[in-house]
Amino acid sequence: PYAPVDLDLTECDYGQWQGRTLSDLATEDLWPVVQSQPSAVVFPGGESMASMQARSVAAIRRHDAAFEAEYGPGAVWVAVSHGDIIKSILADALGMHLDLFQRINVGPASVSIVRYAASRPSVYATNTDAGDLSWLSNGIHSGDAPVGGGAGQKAP
């Protein structure tokens, strides 16, 4: 199947920080702000963390609406991106302010699952790299949360 490339899901434009080591960046005056108040960060010669989140969340919601329109509610689809993009999308789906997104861990090649419904997004998994995801073939149905959290997903 066709896999489009969406530039709105590319990593943050770190500008002059691009390609530098984390240990080197940690010596910059901006580093503590990146860690504690990312919503206030504009990378020198790059973009702001807030604009990165706005474009990536808009792209995910746009793709989700298009897949639902074409394949129906509960359609399962995949987006592949980078850590800060994924963390910012998860923060939005969890209703977290961008300043809290550093609390979310996203490992390389991990899977996070968000389902957008009419009333709100629901987060089904974050940062997982274990287990069989075949239960997704049944689709994910979001609506009101079950009382007591429900009994989890039913295996196919």
Residue ranges and their predicted role:
Residues 16, 24, 28-29, 115-156:
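An N-terminal RHG(E/S)-centered segment typical of histidine phosphatases
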Residues 58-120:
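Active-site-adjacent alpha-helix immediately C-terminal to a catalytic or transition-state-stabilizing loop
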Residues 9-11, 40, 112, 117, ...:
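Short, solvent-exposed coil/turn elements at secondary-structure transition points
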Residues 18-21, 92-96, 138-139:
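Short, glycine/charged-enriched secondary-structure capping and boundary segments
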Residues 1-32, 156:
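Phosphate-coordination/substrate-recognition cap region in phosphate-metabolizing enzymes
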Residues 51-58:
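A non-catalytic, amphipathic alpha-helix used as a structural packing/dimerization or gating element
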Residues 30-51, 147-151:
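Short glycine/proline- and acidic residue-enriched helix-loop micro-motifs
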